[in-house]
A protein has these predicted regions:
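C-terminal interaction segment
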Residues: 2-27, 41-44, 60-73, 78-101, ...
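A short acidic/basic microdomain associated with nuclease active sites
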Residues: 48-60
Length: 228
């Protein structure tokens, strides 16, 4: 959420920029699963690009010296910034590059009023694309930066992100993302099911290989080596 944090000072007068407000990343399992699905899907999409930083629920401080000006998008993407661990995203330490794309998943604790505050924050501090999804109503709201600022997009059916190239689909009753080449962003459960299936197929292949080796040995015992 957009946090109004108490500004503390070190003995030398240096401003402290907290890495957390002690609040959980998500209020419920549905919100958490969507956040993880989006974040991990983007990680995979940009796995070979060292200059794309992706984070979930990370404090973003856009203004140096102003620790009260902070928000933590559910997921944010900063193109042009290196991968790596950060306690928070201090924009003045990131070549003054603001996250270009942010995602928010609506939850009971983050209602429309809170989201309106976040919209103003993203508008003011340079976000190019803002995606807000309501999992209860299955509604996707999209804002894109124009010369007038962050402007709502009217037709969001099968919307494709200009920055990321990913496609948004809500026709199945929930938000589903696809990469530009049509690959689906999988949930944690789906990934585990596919892993289990792959392991079963591997076990079956190993069993067939063992059976073939047994048959081959029986042939050798009876007839000798196979002719070359």
């Amino acid at each position: 959420m957009v946090s109004q944090l108490s500004q503390k000072h070190l003995s030398k007068g240096d401003i402290i920029y907290p890495d957390s407000d002690g609040k959980p990343m998500a209020d419920n399992t549905k919100q958490f699963e969507l956040i993880v699905e989006i974040k991990k899907g983007l990680d995979l999409l940009y796995i070979n690009d060292p200059e794309v930083f992706i984070a979930g629920d990370l404090f973003w401080y856009p203004v140096q010296g102003q620790s009260k000006i902070v928000t933590a998008p559910d997921v944010m993407v900063a193109i042009g910034r290196p991968k790596g661990d950060r306690g928070s995203y201090k924009q003045w330490e990131e070549n003054n590059i603001a996250p270009q794309v942010v995602f928010e998943i609506l939850s009971p604790a983050n209602g429309r009023i809170e989201m309106s505050r976040k919209l103003l924050f993203f508008e003011r501090y340079g976000v190019e694309e803002y995606y807000l999804y309501d999992p209860e109503e299955n509604v996707l709201d999209v804002w894109q930066r124009t010369f007038e600022g962050l402007t709502p997009v009217e037709a969001t059916d099968n919307w494709q992100s200009p920055r990321l190239g990913i496609r948004f689909d809500i026709t199945s009753g929930r938000l589903q993302l696809y990469s530009a080449d049509g690959k689906k962003f999988y949930s944690y459960i789906e990934v585990n099911l596919m892993l289990d299936q792959a392991n079963q197929q591997l076990d079956q292949a190993n069993q067939q290989l063992t059976e073939m080796e047994v048959m081959l040995q029986k042939y050798r015992d009876r007839f000798g080596e196979l002719p070359t």
